Regions:
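Acidic, metal/ion-coordinating pockets
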Residues: 1-158, 180-192
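Flexible, glycine/charged-enriched surface loops at secondary-structure junctions
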Residues: 62-65, 162-170, 200
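Residues that form generic nucleotide/phosphate-binding pockets
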Residues: 152-159, 163, 174, 196
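Glycine-rich phosphate/diphosphate-binding loops and the adjacent beta-loop-alpha structural elements
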Residues: 163-184
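Glycine-rich, aromatic-lined ligand/substrate-binding cores of catalytic
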Residues: 192, 196-200
Length: 200
């Protein structure tokens, strides 16, 4: 593995293991030179070994932080044992409340920072006995930016500021991108491809 598969945390007196699961289709969704020599896959048997290892090391709660996608992780939940939570991504689904599949809670928090997913677990004797979950909408115009993070971003951006501010063209309408749904920005890109390739 390139990265450690398991990280341990203690919250509220409970030992929590978080297992990472990378996007399994990386080799077919990215140029080969970017992932040369690496292999990717869903690999439920490897995830199960990591769950077992986490439990042996004293984890009371095991969380899978996954980029498989909501549909894949629903199927995965049916095959794994002793997995408490899957925080799933990639498919950008915004699920209002966690769903329970095979005693594994799945939560998907949308995309592009529109929501923060929150799940509260009631743990008794190393078992999840109850839970509450929700999506918290993020309204960027009412949240004050973190000054330290703003300074860090500005510092990273500074060498490229002139290039980032170069005008490439002007639009008569607002260009936006929604994430799950098409927006005007998507239309511009698709129209440009069709014009360039002379397609319908």
């Amino acid at each position: 593995p390139v990265f450690e598969a398991i990280k341990f945390f203690e919250r509220g007196g409970v030992n929590i293991a978080v297992i990472g699961q990378h996007f399994p289709y990386t080799p077919i969704s990215n140029p080969k030179y970017m992932v040369e020599g690496w292999s990717f896959g869903i690999r439920p048997e490897v995830i199960q070994k990591n769950i077992n290892k986490a439990k042996k090391k004293g984890a009371e709660v095991v969380v899978l932080l996954s980029h498989n996608g909501f549909d894949v992780d629903q199927k995965l939940a049916l095959t794994l044992q002793d997995l408490d939570v899957i925080l799933t991504g990639h498919t950008h689904d915004a699920i209002p409340e966690a769903i329970n599949i095979n005693n594994t809670l799945l939560l998907s928090s949308g995309s592009h920072g529109k929501y923060i997913g929150r799940i509260d677990l009631d743990i008794k004797k190393g078992k999840v006995v109850d839970y509450a979950s929700k999506l918290i909408p993020i309204f960027s115009d009412v949240i004050n930016p973190d000054p330290e993070m703003t300074e860090h971003i500005n510092k990273l951006r500074q060498p490229y500021e002139q290039e980032c501010n170069r005008v490439l063209g002007k639009a008569d309408t607002l260009l936006y991108r929604r994430g799950n749904f098409n927006g005007t920005w998507d239309d511009v890109i698709c129209d440009a491809i069709m014009i360039e390739r002379d397609t319908e």
